[in-house]
């Protein structure tokens, strides 16, 4: 009986050994197959999720009210305007500034009459034009940027509008070491800072200057002077030496991407050449770029509130907001 039991045990052990030797690869195959099936099933469960395209890096907090029943909607409106528009509190002042410490609450209540829920409108001030490259992020469903226009800054405003109304991909530039060239019509160099004086020297295929001497910056052609923001456009596919004061100005190599459809710009102008076709009172031109002919900031905000639907209808809201590495967007 004992011998029979031992024989049986030996036979079982031999069978197991043969199974392990002959069918080990099959076991590994089955394990791998199970893992693949698990991954595929996980992907299928996520197939109804939304996918997003890169926009630009986000370094701040989201401003807005998140819809808890649909986390892919960010129902909010951000309005950016210069902090110089806010004056000192006092009744009956005629300086045209917002002389009220509670202006945000007052405007928010007026926006409620147009259908914006309480807490969904955010008022943000900026100090200088270059803030729009350096720090400001368009993180709301809808964004309206208000910029005063004068004869002195009309060129800058054109370039700010180009920057704000589009999505950009940028890299830092080291002009001390490298030469740079632009490779297409959507490739620009963005200069921003306190004082941007940018001059260039185009080079031929032998690295000699075209109309300039690379070693002598005095012979360079000036493209920007005394500006806070400039989009530098040079001849494509030609290498350039670049000269600028890197203490007061930074330069980035940028490529324009898709339109930022959730953002509109409002230019405040009282110039004699005011283009009335861009006024929201005439429904604008649906280009997300408007003009308001006014000097008083309360009048400006009242006009924006009263015609907010005209602004909103020219835009497409941003759906979805944040993940740790930066913010991404997708339009409806």
Curated annotation (Swiss-Prot):
Any one Pfam family match given in the protein's UniProt record, by short name: VP7
Signal peptide per UniProt: 1-49
GO CC, alphabetical: host cell endoplasmic reticulum lumen; T=13 icosahedral viral capsid; viral outer capsid
Main location (coarse class): virion
Domain of life assignment: Viruses
Subcellular location field: Virion; Host endoplasmic reticulum lumen
Record Gene3D superfamilies: Glycoprotein VP7, domain 1, Rotavirus outer-layer protein VP7, domain 2
Keyword vocabulary terms for this entry: Calcium, Capsid protein, Disulfide bond, Glycoprotein, Host endoplasmic reticulum, Host-virus interaction, Metal-binding, Outer capsid protein, Signal, T=13 icosahedral capsid protein, Virion
GO MF, any single term: metal ion binding
Record's keyword annotation contains Transferase: no
Post-translational modification: N-glycosylated.
InterPro entries named among the record's database cross-references: VP7, VP7_1, VP7_2
Subunit note: Homotrimer; disulfide-linked. 2 Ca(2+) ions bound at each subunit interface in the trimer hold the trimer together. Interacts with the intermediate capsid protein VP6. Interacts with the outer capsid protein VP5*.
Entry function: Calcium-binding protein that interacts with rotavirus cell receptors once the initial attachment by VP4 has been achieved. Rotavirus attachment and entry into the host cell probably involves multiple sequential contacts between the outer capsid proteins VP4 and VP7, and the cell receptors. Following entry into the host cell, low intracellular or intravesicular Ca(2+) concentration probably causes the calcium-stabilized VP7 trimers to dissociate from the virion. This step is probably necessary for the membrane-disrupting entry step and the release of VP4, which is locked onto the virion by VP7.
Family to which the UniProt record says this protein belongs: Belongs to the rotavirus VP7 family.
Annotated protein name in UniProt: Outer capsid glycoprotein VP7
Species this protein is from: Rotavirus C (isolate RVC/Cow/Japan/Shintoku/1991/G2P[3]) (RV-C)
Taxonomic lineage of the native organism: Viruses, Riboviria, Orthornavirae, Duplornaviricota, Resentoviricetes
